[in-house]
């Protein structure tokens, strides 16, 4: 049922996995979501509202997932002299 969603997530994770300075993760929140008669979707609760409903077009069932993306290239290199200069000294 969620083959297309799984493929999209796999492609996203595979793309990010090839880069050492990026991290992308997807976690299942332990619940599903469904489309209501009025077109709205049931809420995904838990994890401080990090969970969102992801569903395929035209489907009435979805998965509650939490996604995380971090671009480590925005941070300095750990061997940068500025970091060493800012370190506490004894």
UniProtKB/Swiss-Prot annotation:
Cystines in this chain: 29-51, 33-53, 44-64
GO molecular function, one term: C-X-C chemokine binding
Keyword Glycoprotein: yes
Glycosylation sites per record: 32
Assigned keywords, A-Z: Disulfide bond, Glycoprotein, Secreted, Signal
Protein's UniProt keywords contain Disulfide bond: yes
Protein's cellular compartments: Secreted
Superkingdom of source: Eukaryota
Any one of the GO CC terms: extracellular region
Residues of the signal peptide: 1-18
Membrane-spanning parts: none
Protein purpose: Salivary chemokine-binding protein which binds to host chemokines CXCL1, CXCL2, CXCL3, CXCL5 and CXCL8.
Name of protein: Evasin P1128
Organism whose genome encodes this protein: Ixodes ricinus
Organism classification: Eukaryota, Metazoa, Ecdysozoa, Arthropoda, Chelicerata
């Amino acid at each position: 049922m969620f083959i297309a969603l799984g493929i999209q997530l796999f492609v996203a994770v595979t793309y990010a996995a090839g880069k050492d300075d990026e991290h992308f993760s997807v976690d299942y929140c332990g619940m599903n979501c469904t489309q209501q008669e009025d077109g709205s979707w049931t809420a995904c609760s838990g994890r401080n509202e990090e969970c969102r409903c992801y569903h395929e077009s035209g489907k009435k069932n979805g998965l509650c997932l939490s996604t995380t993306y971090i671009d480590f290239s925005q941070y300095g290199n750990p061997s940068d002299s500025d970091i060493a200069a800012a370190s506490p000294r004894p």
